[in-house]
Regions:
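Alpha-helical promoter-recognition and RNA polymerase-docking modules of transcription initiation factors
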Residues: 1-101
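Charged, low-cysteine interdomain linkers and short loop/connector segments
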Residues: 95-122
Length: 122
């Protein structure tokens, strides 16, 4: 029988690594949907950021993992309702980091401190 996210979260908060794995597994399809939607909506396939949906899913898993210790079932909220923003934000953080790295590769300073496209530096 499949355990609820809330029960698995409570066990994971007590240090049960198997419960944490099950919690991630229970929400794999949700994380995949968020990753696919974000990948398409931001046109990441054409962005040059070297990100794919697997990268976003991994970031989403980390977002879910980080939500576990902060979740309070006593507030009456479902775990996934609580974790969804953390999952999305973790994916967006990955995109922002990739974009910053992309910009860094594209721009460099010349000897006078003037920013130039990397292809003109030298």
């Amino acid at each position: 029988m499949k355990q609820t996210n809330e029960r698995l979260c409570a066990l994971a908060q007590k240090g049960d690594a198997t419960a944490l794995d099950s919690l991630i597994d229970n929400n794999k399809s949700f994380i995949g949907k968020v990753a696919n939607d974000l990948f398409r909506s931001m046109n990441l396939a054409q962005s040059g950021l070297n990100l794919d949906t697997d990268d976003l899913k991994q970031a989403g898993n980390m977002g879910l993992w980080k939500a576990v210790p902060k979740f309070d079932a006593a507030r009456g909220m479902k775990f996934l309702t609580y974790a969804a923003p953390a999952i999305h934000n973790a994916m967006m953080d990955m995109v922002r980091d990739a974009f910053a790295a992309f910009e860094q590769r594209m721009v460099t300073e010349d000897k006078d401190g003037i920013l130039l496209p990397a292809r003109f530096a030298g």
